[in-house]
Each structure stands twice: as C-alpha cells, then as structure tokens.
Amino acid sequence: MATAVLLRMPLPPTATSCIHQLSSNAHVVSLSLPSILLFVLHFRGVAIAAGDPLQLAAYGVTETSVEVSAYRSRSWADTFSYSYGQTVRLSGQHRQGAGDGLRGILERMRYGKTSDADIAVLNGTWGTNGDEKWLEFTHLRARNADAMAHNKVMLANLPADPVTFQCVDTIQVTHEDQIRDARTKLGKLAPPSVVVCVGATVVLTRTLSASLTAGAHGKVNAVDPGVSVMVDFFGHPTPMTLTVEVFCVKDALERTQAERRQIPLLLAWGITVSRAQGMTLRRVAIDFSCCEWTLDCLAYSAISRAVALDCLRVKGLRRSHIRTCTSGLKYYREIEEQERQ
C-alpha cells in the first residue's frame, strides 16, 4: 500500500522543490523515510509522486522531534492537499503477490494488528541451523555498525584481497554550518570508503539504467583498484563494469552545494533497513535477536522488502518489535476516510 500525490502541471516552485527534496533523500522534507519517492510520472498534465507514510521515518524524525515528516508540515498541506493537487490512497501491493501469505501478514502489521499466529509464521521461516544456511541471504540490521560487522565476517571468509575505494569530495559552500550539513548529507548518499573484493556480494546504490536500478544485487568478479569494479548482477544477462559516479547535494533552488565521487556499490551480505528502503530483495534474512529494534515501523519496513514468504527468513521477532507510527497511521486513515465520503 502507498499514497499518491496528484499534481496539476506545470508545478509551482514549492512543489518542484519538495519533489526534488523527497527524491534526493532530504532530511527535513522526507515524507516518512529516506527514499520515500518511489516514482514520479507525468501523464496528461498530471504528475504522480508515490510513497508510504507507514514506512521507516527519516533519520532523526520521531513523533516528538522538532523536525517532522513532510505530511505533517504546513507546506505539505498547502502545496499537495489544497492549492495544486490532492493525496489519494493506492490499493494493492507492487512487491508481494495477492496469493502469497506474506501480503496479509504485512497488511495487518502496518496497522498494528499483528496476531500471535503471524509472529509464529514469520519466526518459523528460520528453521533449524538457519544461522549457517542463510548466510547468502541479504541480512537486514537496525544499525549500520551491526550491518558492517556482518559484512566484515563474510569478507574475511573470501580468499581474495579486499580493495578500498576512497571518495573524493568537492564542497562548494563556505559557511561552517553549511559545510558540516553538506558533509552529513554526502555521507547519506555514499560512504567515504567502499571495500570490495572478488566474490563479494554487493548492492548497487544508484540507478544506472532502466534494467539496472538501485538495490540490484550481484557478485564481484573483477576489481581494478581505484578505477572500476566488474559485477555479475542477479537477473542481468551480462557482467557490468562500474566506475566512479558523482553524488550531489543540492539546495531547494537546485544549486549544487557539494559533490562526492565514489563507486556506487556497498557490501550487501548485511545492510541497514534504512539503506534497504525502496529495494526489492529476492532473499531476506532478519535476526531480531541480534540487535536493538526500537524505531517505529522498523520491523514492517524490514520485512516488507521481501517479495514472498518463501524468500524470507525471520528469527527472534517479538510483539515489542512491531511498532507503528501514530502520526503516519492517523494521516493514512484520514485519506481513507476522505475517500469514503
């Protein structure tokens, strides 16, 4: 499920700015998660932006924080609910099939109505000796340190030597606060260093073509240090050679504030739930017992990355892990109520 914003064209500057910030992982105007903007389509003078307010919130945004999710802001209401467009609820799921058991479980989870039977079904997917059997699955973690720790263990098991790609940054703002803010945002777009080696499982962090999108997984089969990485992406017919890409931080007026040049890859045996937002993962393993899971919507956001129940492995899930976002749920139900009137 998701919500869609329908906007008349041409868009006013406020709407254009907000859409840019949504699609570029902005902190303040993030609808509910870092990569909330799933797509923007233009059809007969209407732009459609879609996202889910019941997914994981942007970094630092909570029910009590000063900064709020975009749908709780005045500018959101003024721009998308009254002056230039409307918000509607999308029916159906784009990731899970209608006949799969995971779809019903997720629908109950997003509303905070998970049953004991649902939890038992999810925990039953791990099976016996799962710690050894599911190593090749993508393991989702709540914190970056936990994901990196898992990747470090897996990397050490490979015979090839690891290669590190260091970023090159260009900062175009001069004020100390702006520089600090730009560096923080660059870190969310691409890490300062990326470690790869032949045989490593990696994830693409940037969409390069219609057939090779952010979230694509593959295995490294060659590395040219400091220059390129050749990857066999799952489902892609031929190996792809990736070179350094430019990641930009821009302000509301589309002016570039900073750039980071980095290879668009990350080790992907383990990744954070926030990094996985927007990704469709063909094999997902989540051990809820190995680290803290305290944020609203974190469990739902993690489990919903899987396409089907038989592609998912879950361990240690408890009812206390399943937390909904009060404001997101209220907003979503308001849209439902408006549609019934």
Feature names for model-found ranges:
Residues 1-341:
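Conserved ATP-binding/catalytic motifs of P-loop helicase motor domains
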